């Protein structure tokens, strides 16, 4: 669950330029508050004065207009950053919006799963397991069809010799 921390006005003014990605605050390094390394969701263009006017926007709108605070480098769905215990260092790059289409999140999960399975497959050969012979099997199947043709042509020739009617 994300909560909106309450800031003191001086802390909020110091961190407003850092939240927008404009570099370090002009006042220098003050006490490390939770607002120094967090920012609003990138899709919401609210400034600090708007937050002061409506500090409890989630209770007025039933949660629909709630401001979500997350770290700058986070591009994962809710809960992954806190669970993994990642550092709270700000990144120079802006994180992906949480309003990205669900297909994107599904594609990323699918891609990670495929990558994991591929890595397991490659690692299995390092453990001494034999390589699969799927390419050889495909070659044998093609050869068996050509052997069938050879056998049929031989059969046709032999039947043609034994019978009075010429073959072909």
From Swiss-Prot:
A motif (BH3) lies at residues 110-124. The modification Phosphoserine is found at residues 25, 75, 91, 97, 99, 118, 134. The keyword Membrane applies. Residues 1-105, 125-145 are annotated as: Disordered. Residues 49-60, 136-145 have a biased composition (Polar residues). The modification N-acetylmethionine is found at residue 1. Expressed in a wide variety of tissues. One of its GO terms (biological process) is glucose catabolic process. It is found in: Mitochondrion outer membrane; Cytoplasm. GO terms for molecular function: cysteine-type endopeptidase activator activity; cysteine-type endopeptidase activator activity involved in apoptotic process; lipid binding; phospholipid binding; protein kinase binding; protein phosphatase binding. The modification Omega-N-methylarginine is found at residue 161. The modification Asymmetric dimethylarginine is found at residues 94, 96. GO terms for cellular component: BAD-BCL-2 complex; cytosol; mitochondrial outer membrane; mitochondrion. Its main location: mitochondrion. Phosphorylated on one or more of Ser-75, Ser-99, Ser-118 and Ser-134 in response to survival stimuli, which blocks its pro-apoptotic activity. Phosphorylation on Ser-99 or Ser-75 promotes heterodimerization with 14-3-3 proteins. This interaction then facilitates the phosphorylation at Ser-118, a site within the BH3 motif, leading to the release of Bcl-X(L) and the promotion of cell survival. Ser-99 is the major site of AKT/PKB phosphorylation, Ser-118 the major site of protein kinase A (CAPK) phosphorylation. Keywords: Acetylation, Apoptosis, Cytoplasm, Membrane, Methylation, Mitochondrion, Mitochondrion outer membrane, Phosphoprotein. Forms heterodimers with the anti-apoptotic proteins, Bcl-X(L), Bcl-2 and Bcl-W. Also binds protein S100A10. The Ser-75/Ser-99 phosphorylated form binds 14-3-3 proteins. Interacts with AKT1 and PIM3. Interacts (via BH3 domain) with NOL3 (via CARD domain); preventing the association of BAD with BCL2. Interacts with HIF3A (via C-terminus domain); the interaction reduces the binding between BAD and BAX. Interacts with GIMAP3/IAN4 and GIMAP5/IAN5. Promotes cell death. Successfully competes for the binding to Bcl-X(L), Bcl-2 and Bcl-W, thereby affecting the level of heterodimerization of these proteins with BAX. Can reverse the death repressor activity of Bcl-X(L), but not that of Bcl-2. Appears to act as a link between growth factor receptor signaling and the apoptotic pathways. Belongs to the Bcl-2 family. Intact BH3 motif is required by BIK, BID, BAK, BAD and BAX for their pro-apoptotic activity and for their interaction with anti-apoptotic members of the Bcl-2 family. This is Bcl2-associated agonist of cell death. It comes from Homo sapiens (Human). The lineage of its organism: Eukaryota, Metazoa, Chordata, Craniata, Vertebrata.
């Amino acid at each position: 669950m994300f909560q909106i921390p309450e800031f003191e006005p001086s802390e909020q003014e110091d961190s407003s330029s850092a939240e927008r990605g404009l570099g370090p605050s002009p006042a220098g390094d003050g006490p490390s508050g939770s607002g120094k390394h967090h920012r609003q969701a990138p899709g919401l263009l609210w400034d600090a004065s708007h937050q002061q006017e409506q500090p409890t926007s989630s209770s007025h709108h039933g949660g629909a207009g709630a401001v979500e605070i997350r770290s700058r480098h986070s591009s994962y769905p809710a809960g992954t950053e806190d669970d993994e215990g990642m550092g709270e260092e700000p990144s120079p790059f802006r994180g992906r919006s949480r309003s990205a289409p669900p297909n994107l999140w599904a594609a990323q999960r699918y891609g990670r799963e495929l990558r994991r399975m591929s890595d397991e497959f490659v690692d299995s050969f390092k453990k001494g397991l034999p390589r699969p012979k799927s390419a050889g099997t495909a070659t044998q199947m093609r050869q068996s069809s050509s052997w069938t043709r050879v056998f049929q042509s031989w059969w046709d020739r032999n039947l043609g010799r034994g019978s009075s009617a010429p073959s072909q």
